């Protein structure tokens, strides 16, 4: 007699929308939910946001902005806030209003750190600028 039991943990409604970021510069993504599974691909981008779509013990199944999926050990994930700009030429403003001074433009796909969010705006930073971008133009953890 075989009895199959599922160890998979069901995501609650908050986790379904949860994002985390990559803790290290290099992170292995596996085909399954243990170190026994082969590496599917490797991320080489610290702070890259990933969406959590499933959980199995100490592994989380993630999906990135380009819809790539795989499993990452929890030790390689962080709660640091970061996002990807999803609109070409988003404007970074000095204050959270379109009537504020424009500081720069963000190209689509640009990774930014998120300092805080206020209503429809997020204060972000990259290597060159710190300012406010509309939240609707960001994908990730904030």
Predicted regions and their residues:
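Bacterial N-terminal signal peptides
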Residues: 1-6
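SH3-family beta-barrel domains
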Residues: 9-31, 41-46, 53-95, 99-120, ...
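Second-shell loop/turn segments in exported
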Residues: 33-37
């Amino acid at each position: 007699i075989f009895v199959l039991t599922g160890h998979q943990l069901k995501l609650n409604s908050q986790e379904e929308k949860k994002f985390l970021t990559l803790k290290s510069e290099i992170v292995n993504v596996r085909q399954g939910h243990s170190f026994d599974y082969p590496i599917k691909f490797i991320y080489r981008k610290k702070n890259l946001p990933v969406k959590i779509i499933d959980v199995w013990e100490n592994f989380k199944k993630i999906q990135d902005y380009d819809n790539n999926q795989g499993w990452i050990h929890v030790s390689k994930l962080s709660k640091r806030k970061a996002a990807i700009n999803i609109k070409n030429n988003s404007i970074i403003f000095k204050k959270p209003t379109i009537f504020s001074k424009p500081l720069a433009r963000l190209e689509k796909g640009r990774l930014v750190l998120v300092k805080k969010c206020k209503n429809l705006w997020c204060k972000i930073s990259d290597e060159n600028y710190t300012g406010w971008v509309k939240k609707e133009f960001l994908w990730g953890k904030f």
